[in-house]
């Protein structure tokens, strides 16, 4: 009898580590704060993100209801017949943090410029000299797989955010020394990594928590991690694809059992496994640091926004509600297609080509106007509509009311302006 009673008591014991306890405590405190709709600080992106974000997770049933569900009314459940059940500790609270994909069908489409703007907002303080900046006062992990990270450009973008805010508020512009001090302090919280392959990228992500939790290696110990940025996630795709094809060629004629054993032990290269491991590591870090993930991709078989899909492309032709919406599958293997919360497509605003019948004088007359349009550096962003035939009707209606999810932005020498 005593042994049976002790066994029942043990079933009610919930064991967890200190890290899980602190994680749940922080998440619980955050849930009591007013809900902010500014995940990234860019109004059109945040508005679109709200449409695609699933309901907030982390709520759990009261102990009695939970016991009823878990026991399914079974009288043989551990606490049946022993009075009110003891409170069952809630499961680990899981808050939802967005994953943003920014893709294009060509280079120089504005992807990295948006990333710089997002990173600048993440590291800047929430206010400057008492004036709200819209910054998050956090740290950013920037994984530069393309080898093109430009710290000076990031500094310029961050400076423009401060100066444009001061100008809008009518504040004094003679604060250059304070602005530079703020920029210097903020840029210390951008942690740049430059892996040279997908396997190196996985290793970087696997050791990232060790680095971030070692307060002797950086000055961001008192700041939360706002986002992990990968620019770009497709940087190593073609070399990975070649390596995968070589590995599959070497497997010809070998016993299937040996091939599978090596795959399970990760002794051989598999493209699908590598990219699945990348997503798994990013999700692990998201759960650990409660941060967003932002990554860029370049689609290898997409089309420009203004062009219509054909029957032989990678476009979804089943839905005609948004005929001008760009729509192409993820260029990366599964599960990357389902990983992002919001998929954006960006491109430079196209300039209408000359008419085939235009004369030389007409071309010369229009040339200055066309050059002026090019110099404006105007870009357009939109929701990637791949799979929209499965989207809820309410979501489609909301997108229709929001110009089909299209927004404009201008990239200038000093920064980015969103329409």
Predicted regions and their residues:
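N-terminal regions of ATP-driven nucleic-acid and macromolecular assemblies
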Residues: 1-419
């Amino acid at each position: 009898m005593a042994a049976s009673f002790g066994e029942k008591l043990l079933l009610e014991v919930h064991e967890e580590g200190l890290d899980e306890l602190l994680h749940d405590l922080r998440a619980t405190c955050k849930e009591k704060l007013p809900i902010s709709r500014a995940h990234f600080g860019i109004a059109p992106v945040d508005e679109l993100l709200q449409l695609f974000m699933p309901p907030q997770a982390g709520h759990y049933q009261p102990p009695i209801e939970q016991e009823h569900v878990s026991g399914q009314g079974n009288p043989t459940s551990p606490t049946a017949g022993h009075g009110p059940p003891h409170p069952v500790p809630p499961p680990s609270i899981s808050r939802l943090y967005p994953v943003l994909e920014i893709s294009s069908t060509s280079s120089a489409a504005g992807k990295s410029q948006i990333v710089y703007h997002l990173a600048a907002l993440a590291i800047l303080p929430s206010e400057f000299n008492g004036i709200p900046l819209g910054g998050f006062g956090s740290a950013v992990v920037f994984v530069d797989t393309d080898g093109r990270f430009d710290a000076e450009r990031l500094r310029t973008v961050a400076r423009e955010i401060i100066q444009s805010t001061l100008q809008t508020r009518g504040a004094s512009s003679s604060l250059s020394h304070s602005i530079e001090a703020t920029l210097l302090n903020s840029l210390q919280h951008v942690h740049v990594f430059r892996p040279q392959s997908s396997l190196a990228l996985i290793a970087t992500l696997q050791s990232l928590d060790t680095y971030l939790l070692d307060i002797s290696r950086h000055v961001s110990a008192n700041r939360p991690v706002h986002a992990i940025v990968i620019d770009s996630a497709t940087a190593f795709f073609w070399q990975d694809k070649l390596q995968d094809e070589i590995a599959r060629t070497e497997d010809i004629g070998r016993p299937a059992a040996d091939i599978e054993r090596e795959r399970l032990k990760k002794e051989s290269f598999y493209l699908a496994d590598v990219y699945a491991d990348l997503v798994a590591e990013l999700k692990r870090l998201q759960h650990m640091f409660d941060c967003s993930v932002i990554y860029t991709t370049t689609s290898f078989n997409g089309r420009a926004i203004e062009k219509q899909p054909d029957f032989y492309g990678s476009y979804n032709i089943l839905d005609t509600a948004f005929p001008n919406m760009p729509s192409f599958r993820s260029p990366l293997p599964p599960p990357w297609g389902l990983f992002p919360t919001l998929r954006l497509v960006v491109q430079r605003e196209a300039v209408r080509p000359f008419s085939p019948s235009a004369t030389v004088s007409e071309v010369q007359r229009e040339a200055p106007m066309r050059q002026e349009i090019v110099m404006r550096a105007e870009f357009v962003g939109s929701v990637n509509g791949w799979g929209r035939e499965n989207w809820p009707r309410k979501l489609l209606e909301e997108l229709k009311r929001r110009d089909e999810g299209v927004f404009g932005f201008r990239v200038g020498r000093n920064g980015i302006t969103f329409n």
